[in-house]
Amino acid sequence: MATTSRSSLKRYYDVNGWLFVAPAIALISVFMLYPILRSLVLSLYTGRGMMLKFSGTGNLVRLWNDPVFWQALQNTVIFFVVQVPIMITMALILAAMLNNPKLRYSGLFRTMIFLPCVSSLVAYSILFKSMFSLDGVVNNTLLAIGIIGEPIGWLTDPFWAKVLIIIAITWRWTGYNMIFYLAALQNIDRSIYEAAKIDGVPSWGRFAFLTIPMLKPVILFTTITSTIGTLQLFDEVYNFTEGTGGPANSTLTLSLYIYNLTFRFMPSFSYAATVSYVIVLMVAVLSFLQFYAARERK
């Protein structure tokens, strides 16, 4: 009898639990799962606007022969390969410096470093475009101290335009990642570092062989989120180049290309859906590789 009552009670709580989460599941299904599945079906069609016909792998053939897609893919990979390691390294170093209990005004420094990620995207884009213009403060400063002989075309030269985008997103998101590392560092027992110091381990050794291994779960998390964010890079490129991805498509990313295919050029929803699944595939593969590289080895 008691067993039957416990079983009934468990079933009651199970049903109640599902009823509580049912509205959230329904909303997720309507606003997330359905668009994902719909875009997958849409990628099997070709045409302009809503005048579509089934083509199977037609969009994949178009993708393979599309030079603009390959340019956007190359730019996205460059941003990922260059920017993410720089940002993660800087965030780690800043967190280690701010974790020093002897550092004065650490709260002020934390606020200053974190502030860019909560600043207005449009405002900071306008500020960066002004600072890095031909007669902006950056060029004037570099000219004044003799580093360059003529102004750099930060917004007009393909190479320097990429550099500017990398500088901008690194400036904006380094503080965001630093907060995660700082929170993790403050949960590490200081006696571990004191013992290592007594044993004669230098500061770089304590950082490399104590701090980094203990922060591995947080590093994995921030690396994956940064990877996803960089592969979906859109905001900075759109605001800096007014949606063109210029000069000469040198800053065009996959996300901006999808936007242009959908809203800027003659609508090609099905082809845009196909390109979007390239981002999904890249995120899945890179996330798996990062999880695999960070796995616990016996």
From Swiss-Prot:
GO terms for biological process: transmembrane transport. CDD domains: TM_PBP2. It comes from the Bacteria. Part of the binding-protein-dependent transport system for lactose. Probably responsible for the translocation of the substrate across the membrane. The chain crosses the membrane at residues 17-37, 77-97, 112-132, 151-171, 208-228, 269-289. Residues 73-290 form the ABC transmembrane type-1 domain. It comes from Rhizobium radiobacter. Belongs to the binding-protein-dependent transport system permease family. MalFG subfamily. Induction: By lactose and various galactosides, and subject to catabolite repression by glucose, galactose and succinate. In strain AR50 the expression of the lac operon is constitutive. This is Lactose transport system permease protein LacF.
